[in-house]
Amino acid sequence: MAKYSTLSLILLTLSLLPPSSARPKLLLFLIDGFRFDYISDGELQHLPGFRHMVERGVKVDYMTPAFPSLSYPNYYTLMTGRHCETHHMTGNFMWDPKKNISFDIGANEDSRLPQWWDGAEPLWVTMEKAKRKVSMYYWPGCEVEIRAIKPNYCREYFYYPSEAEFGKSVTDALQSLTRGNAEMAAVYYERIDVEGHHHGPWSEERKNVTRELDQILWHLHQQIREMGLESELNVILFSDHGMTDVFWMDKVIELKNYIDMQDIIQMKDRGPVVSLWPAEGKLSKVYEELRAVQHMNVYQKEDIPERFHYKKGTFVSPLTLVAELGWFIIERKEKLPFWNNGTSINIAWQHGWHGYDNELMDMRGVFLAYGPDFKVNFRSAPIRSTDVYNIMCNVLGIEPLPNNGSWSRVQFMLRSSSGFPTTLHLINLWLSVLPLSLILF
């Protein structure tokens, strides 16, 4: 009799697991460089698409990015819930001195090597392992085989998709969800970041692109309503970091004025965070010379502040330079990153940048969400980029992997903070009841 009772309990436990068809699907948007105050209450008056999301869902006051407040480190933090020193994607530019290979903002072939990506498992890989399909559009990294897995569909990133191409990707993502080709669709949008860099965070060019994005979002909301998907689809929109003004003619730190560049065997990146690998026997000399430089801090690896959650990263350099807000570190001014402004020559400075101390206000990002799992017209306290992973796992019914996010910071934005019963919880419940069943029968 006991074996039949045990079988009954197993069947009861399995019956509590929600069928995949019962779970709302998820549409994700990663908007690069979208600062939190781009959708302040005043700005929302002119952005009906964003306003729709706010009024029908959740808006956090702001989202603090991971350090450094750069793109690739935060792409991976958002999709793994881990600090950069834990997933090891610690910069847009990295170097492996043992193999003498580089990761150069995903543009070079070596950037696709597993060593840069296998430090953690992003959500789309976890879903594919669970036989739950994912479609991704221009999402950096979807083209990479991570832990021997790629998403079911990846429309590979290029620099940079037009508004028409982005609009089509949104339509295609929605269709992939409604036609049963995916349970999660993720779309990346870059132009807010591009115009913020080129013209500055409060430029008319950046504002115009925001209005174009808003129109696409408004059209999406209409499609969801017309297709009757309000109760079947969650929509989440977040950014990787913010943006601040830079004034290069006045606020440039030229390293050549302070150190002998012959003492450096490798330098990665420029701007707010710079990584240096001094030649053998030159570390102390270079460090002491850089300590005297104003408007920046220099850290030996072991002295990097704990709050950055950065120094334990595999590819962190012996010396890390961190500039004050608005200052730009470069070897010499001639190497400043210009853009050609539509001409054949480099004639224009950049006017916006990011990557600074992640606690600075201008580096803060945005998080919006609406759908059947989210409260309506709910303003949430600030969250961190590590927290987003747990939200996505909850609405998808995925057991989250170990991560650095906080559930207590985000649970109140959900209609039900308990979420779906997970397999682990149900197994624990079954094990607690099993001894009683053996006694009774």
Curated annotation (Swiss-Prot):
It catalyses: sn-glycerol 3-phosphocholine + H2O = phosphocholine + glycerol + H(+); a 1-acyl-sn-glycero-3-phosphocholine + H2O = a 1-acyl-sn-glycerol + phosphocholine + H(+); a 1-O-alkyl-sn-glycero-3-phosphocholine + H2O = a 1-O-alkyl-sn-glycerol + phosphocholine + H(+); 1-dodecanoyl-sn-glycero-3-phosphocholine + H2O = 1-dodecanoyl-sn-glycerol + phosphocholine + H(+). This is Glycerophosphocholine cholinephosphodiesterase ENPP6. Binds 2 Zn(2+) ions per subunit. It is found in: Cell membrane. Its cofactor is Zn(2+). Keywords: Cell membrane, Disulfide bond, Glycoprotein, GPI-anchor, Hydrolase, Lipid degradation, Lipid metabolism, Lipoprotein, Membrane, Metal-binding, Phosphoprotein, Signal, Zinc. It is an enzyme of class 3 (hydrolase). Zn(2+) 2 binds at D193, H197, H354. Residues 1-22 form the signal peptide. The active site is at S71.
